[in-house]
């Protein structure tokens, strides 16, 4: 069943307050944008991170802005589930937009639709198939994305005319311009579900890594890597994995030979694994918007306090191993 939002074409685009609303698709958010107009035209803040995050929008990290200009009324594109988040809006004109959730899980197949004019934008999470149909000539459809376009990016698709999704297009699909590629997309029953981003456990051959593997088990969304497969101290770590396909990194890797860390060779290895590696992972997580789980140790304190240590206590490491872990913290 399709849910259609009530936005008549004659509604004024002016005078709205910034507002973020949930929809029938989890994570798909509809946003009202304040538009300011006068005799010269109008102005809007199409994306303003501080205000919109405070209003409830995810703090996404856009890296590319695309614009699709459409000459004619009825131009119809979709449905494409892309491997990144999107922030869609229009700079001119108006569209009817529809989405189908293709993410693996209980919301697969959920549908939502609305009209987008210059006073409305929509946040589209990764794995939700996107489409639109122009309702005015010379419509400029614009969108921010959280990853750079690549010919190797993995998409999933569903047909615009799918009977299960039953999208109520304002202009019948047999009367509009659709590419042959879009006409050939599969029905929902044959669409490929988009799997969740993966969790990467680093240091899987170590004591902690083995324990995590025994606890978590083997799943499609879990990946385990040891030093032979992924050297976190390498300056090439940033390009060592398609990091946008991950959600979380659990760093279970560590140089834990406390006595050997006091030797010349051990100091080098301890600093590389414990400090440089952790710093490299932090850079990766910051660059790609990932969650990084870092494991500390009580060795970062000297043990002289008479009470239990807290996370905000001043670091006071004694040996090399402790110093490298404190540097990582």
Where are these regions (language model features)?
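Non-catalytic, conserved peripheral segments adjacent to functional cores
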Residues: 2-116, 136-138, 147-153, 157-196
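N-terminal Rossmann NAD(P)H-binding glycine-rich loop of SDR-like oxidoreductase domains
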Residues: 196-218
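Catalytic helix-loop patch of NAD(P)-dependent Rossmann-fold dehydrogenases
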Residues: 268-277, 287, 300-329
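Adenosine-cofactor binding site in Rossmann-like domains, unifying the SAM/SAH pocket
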Residues: 219-240
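SDR active-site strand-loop-helix element
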Residues: 202, 225, 249-253, 292-297
């Amino acid at each position: 069943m399709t849910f259609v939002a009530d936005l008549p074409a004659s509604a004024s685009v002016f005078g709205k307050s910034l507002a973020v609303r949930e929809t029938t698709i989890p994570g798909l958010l509809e946003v009202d944008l304040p538009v300011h107009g006068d005799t010269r035209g109008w102005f809007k803040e199409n994306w303003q991170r501080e205000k919109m995050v405070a209003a409830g929008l995810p703090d996404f990290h856009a890296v590319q802005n695309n614009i699709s200009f459409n000459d004619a009324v009825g131009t119809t594109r979709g449905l494409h589930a892309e491997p990144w988040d999107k922030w869609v809006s229009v700079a001119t004109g108006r569209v009817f937009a529809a989405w189908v959730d293709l993410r693996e899980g209980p919301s697969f197949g959920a549908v939502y639709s609305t009209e987008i004019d210059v006073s409305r934008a929509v946040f589209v999470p990764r794995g939700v198939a996107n489409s639109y149909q122009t309702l005015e000539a010379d419509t400029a459809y614009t969108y921010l994305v959280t990853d750079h376009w690549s010919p190797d990016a993995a998409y999933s698709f569903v047909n615009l005319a799918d009977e299960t999704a039953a999208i109520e297009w304002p202009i019948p699909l047999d009367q509009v311009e659709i590419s042959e590629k879009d006409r050939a997309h599969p029905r929902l029953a044959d669409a490929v579900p988009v799997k969740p981003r993966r969790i990467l456990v680093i240091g899987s051959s170590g004591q902690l890594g083995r324990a995590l593997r025994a606890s978590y088990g083997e799943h499609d969304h879990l990946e385990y890597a040891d030093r032979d497969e992924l050297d976190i101290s390498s300056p090439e770590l940033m390009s060592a994995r398609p990091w946008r396909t991950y959600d979380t990194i659990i760093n279970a890797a560590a140089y834990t030979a406390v006595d050997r860390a006091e030797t010349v060779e051990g100091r080098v290895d301890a600093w590389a694994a414990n400090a440089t590696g952790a710093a490299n992972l932090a850079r990766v997580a910051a660059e790609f918007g990932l969650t990084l789980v870092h494991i500390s140790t009580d060795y970062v304190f000297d043990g002289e306090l008479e009470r239990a240590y807290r996370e905000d206590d001043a670091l006071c490491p004694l040996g090399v191993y402790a110093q490298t872990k404190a540097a990582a913290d």
